[in-house]
Curated annotation (Swiss-Prot):
InterPro entries associated with the record: 6hp_glycosidase-like_sf, TPD52
Gene source species: Homo sapiens (Human)
Regions of compositional bias (Polar residues) in chain numbering: 1-14
Oligomeric form and interacting partners: Forms a homodimer or heterodimer with other members of the family. Interacts with MAL2.
Taxon lineage: Eukaryota, Metazoa, Chordata, Craniata, Vertebrata
Protein name per UniProt: Tumor protein D54
Name of the gene: TPD52L2
Length: 206
């Protein structure tokens, strides 16, 4: 093997091959440094894409600045209209809840829950439980009514008993006596005052 005719350029596609009639072609370092993403593009196409990328990035920066200015203007308008942050939050929550309600997932879940509820209410176990609770409620109401009637009847019997009447008579007698003593005491007040004005008799001599 002739070492003079061997291609020693590591970047050459003819590396390791003998060539008597061809000379080494210089390799473009820019092409060698290209990433696989831009392979197959000409230099003009790459420059055009890079220019377009720069333009889009500048437009994004401009749009962000415009958006920030619009947000400040929107906040100023809300402040002048008296729209508080709490009201805006409530409005956003209401809108979000409405969006949830009209969403397909919520509708499907509601339909599924409705089907389960219908199955449960139509099941024999649910009906038996409902009947048992209804009977228990009726029995409780009847028992309370019976107890109330018994208490009322017992109180009536106590009022009609001789002991209760004797107690009422005693209370009435005591009340009449107290009232009479008060009236008699008020009548004796002037006489007591008059006796106070009467001169005392002389003591008997020894």
């Amino acid at each position: 093997m002739d070492s003079a005719g061997q291609d020693i350029n590591l970047n050459s596609p003819n590396k390791g091959l003998l060539s008597d009639s061809m000379t080494d072609v210089p390799v473009d370092t820019g092409v060698a440094a290209r990433t696989p993403a831009v392979e197959g593009l000409t230099e003009a196409e790459e420059e055009e894409l890079r220019a377009e990328l720069t333009k889009v990035e500048e437009e994004i920066v401009t749009l962000r600045q415009v958006l920030a200015a619009k947000e400040r203007h929107c906040g100023e308008l809300k402040r002048r209209l008296g729209l508080s942050t709490l009201g805006e939050l409530k409005q956003n929550l209401s809108r979000s809840w409405h969006d949830v309600q009209v969403s397909s997932a919520y509708v499907k879940t509601s339909e599924k829950l409705g089907e389960w509820n219908e199955k449960v209410t139509q099941s024999d176990l649910y009906k038996k439980t409902q009947e048992t609770l209804s009977q228990a409620g009726q029995k409780t109401s009847a028992a309370l009514s019976t107890v109330g009637s018994a208490i009322s009847r017992k109180l009536g019997d106590m009022r009609n008993s001789a002991t209760f009447k004797s107690f009422e008579d005693r209370v009435g007698t005591i009340k009449s006596k107290v009232v009479g003593d008060r009236e008699n005491g008020s009548d004796n007040l002037p006489s007591s005052a008059g006796s106070g004005d009467k001169p005392l008799s002389d003591p008997a001599p020894f």
